[in-house]
Design a protein with these regions (language model features):
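Structured beta-strand/loop patches that form or line metal/cofactor-binding pockets in enzymes
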Residues: 2-54, 58-59, 331-337
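Conserved, mostly hydrophobic/aromatic
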Residues: 11, 50, 74, 111, ...
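Metal- or metallocofactor-binding catalytic centers and their adjacent structured scaffolds
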Residues: 14, 46-122
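A cross-domain feature marking catalytic cores of carbohydrate-active enzymes
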Residues: 57, 142-144, 170-172, 198-202, ...
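Glycine-rich, aromatic-flanked loop segments that form ligand/cofactor-binding clefts
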Residues: 103, 112-147
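Metal-dependent enolase-superfamily TIM-barrel catalytic cores that perform enediolate-based chemistry
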Residues: 133-243
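Shared catalytic-loop signature of beta/alpha-barrel
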Residues: 214, 220, 231-350
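C-terminal extensions of enzymes
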Residues: 332-383
Length: 383
């Protein structure tokens, strides 16, 4: 494709497929009374030159909500625009967010991902190189779901240890006393040479978090993650002061890098978290990573719960210096859909970034069509 044609290309068409996964990954306590189908919305942007940008979006509580936001609020901002105007589009979406759109945390990130995918493909480069490569591989840690019994956590950790993975993150089921038993017995089961992390998903009081954190220090855990809701900054600051154990936070912090900046300013985390789904795409995640780097902090990239978008996470992780791990959500078969193939993890627990242009992996369009609940399309009327 001629350089001038690339420079002048524009977004001609936006398509979405709301796709059923037929899974509910949370227990009744966390699911609550509303529906919790773990659905996915597949998004495709097509340029006038035929280059396609692909992303997936959460549709967990209601695919109607995700679909409507994209088609009613985001599409008018993007249609007819150059995909190279990502930064301008990104800020325009923040403008309409404030003026009574109020996007959910998982939007508008996927649109940004699709724009980056187009531009990397146009350049003929894998996404991580288009961003500016730092590395090609990362060690993974297996990150499990909630389990009702202690033995299930132990079995899961031992299984992934046997697969060559060097670290496991437990999402303990609660209450606090049960979590502490799980922490101890996990360490006993996997031995001292295997790394462990804990993420109770905002279940603790400050006193409980300090008590658990001191236990994790004795057991040589890597970090304690999200013991409180991410907006409880006073509690996080107190916890960071009380413990030597690193505290990881900001997974759900609103306001992208502006929100994370307040956390860093109040010394309310030792490690910040971001991902391309919940932190406004690649553009937002890179801003957070560079912000954290300025303060000597790691930005550990968080799973999107969708393998395709986690490959995008991998590209970002390979384009920044201050990320040590790739979060590998398990069991993988629950998160693969609708991506073709498995995550490229070797027998030593190392994941390698794809080398094809753009994101570099494919979706299974037959599976998407066969499980599609709703399909929508908008085209630029001036095309």
């Amino acid at each position: 494709m001629a350089i001038k044609q690339q420079q002048n290309m524009f977004i001609k068409k936006i398509e979405t497929w709301w796709v059923r996964r037929n899974k509910c990954l949370f227990d009744d306590k966390r699911k609550g009374k509303s529906a919790m189908d773990w659905d996915v919305l597949v998004l495709k942007l097509t340029t006038d030159t035929g280059i396609e940008g692909i992303a997936t979006a959460l549709a967990a509580r209601s695919g109607n909500v995700t679909e409507a936001y994209i088609m009613d609020n985001i599409a008018p901002v993007v249609l007819g625009r150059s995909p190279f105007d990502r930064e301008k589009i990104w800020h325009e979406l923040w403008n309409i967010d404030r003026h009574l759109t109020f996007f959910p945390v998982y939007l508008p990130g996927p649109i940004d991902v699709a724009l980056w995918d187009i531009c990397a493909k146009a350049a003929g480069l894998p996404l991580y190189q288009y961003l500016g490569a730092y590395r090609e591989q990362l060690p993974v840690y297996a990150s499990g779901l909630f389990h009702p019994t202690e033995q299930e956590y132990i079995d899961e950790a031992l299984y992934y240890k046997s697969k060559g993975i060097k670290c496991y993150k437990v999402h303990p089921c609660g209450p606090c006393e049960m979590d502490m038993q799980i922490h101890q017995h996990l360490r006993d089961a996997v031995g001292d040479d295997f790394m462990l992390m804990s993420d109770p998903v905002a279940e603790y009081t400050l006193d409980e978090a300090i008590r658990v954190g001191r236990q994790l220090e004795r057991l040589n855990y890597v970090w304690l993650e999200e013991p409180f809701r991410d907006f409880e900054l006073y509690k996080y600051t107190q916890l960071c002061e009380a413990l030597d154990l690193p505290i990881a936070a900001t997974e759900t912090t609103r306001g992208c890098h502006w929100g994370v900046a307040q956390v860093i300013n109040q010394k309310a985390a030792d490690i910040v978290r971001a991902d391309v789904s919940w932190k406004c795409g690649i553009t937002g995640t890179m801003k957070i990573a560079h912000l954290a780097e300025s303060f000597g902090m790691n930005c550990e990239i968080h799973t999107t719960t969708m393998n395709y978008m986690d490959i995008v996470n991998l590209h970002v992780s390979c384009a920044i210096r201050n990320c040590k791990w790739f979060e590998y959500f398990v069991p993988e078969e629950d998160f693969q859909f609708p991506m073709k193939g498995w995550l490229p993890i070797d027998e030593n627990g190392i994941i390698t970034v794809p080398k094809q242009p753009g994101v570099g992996v494919e979706l299974d369009w037959d599976v998407i069509e066969n499980n599609c609940v709703s399909y929508k399309k908008l085209e630029d009327q001036l095309a």
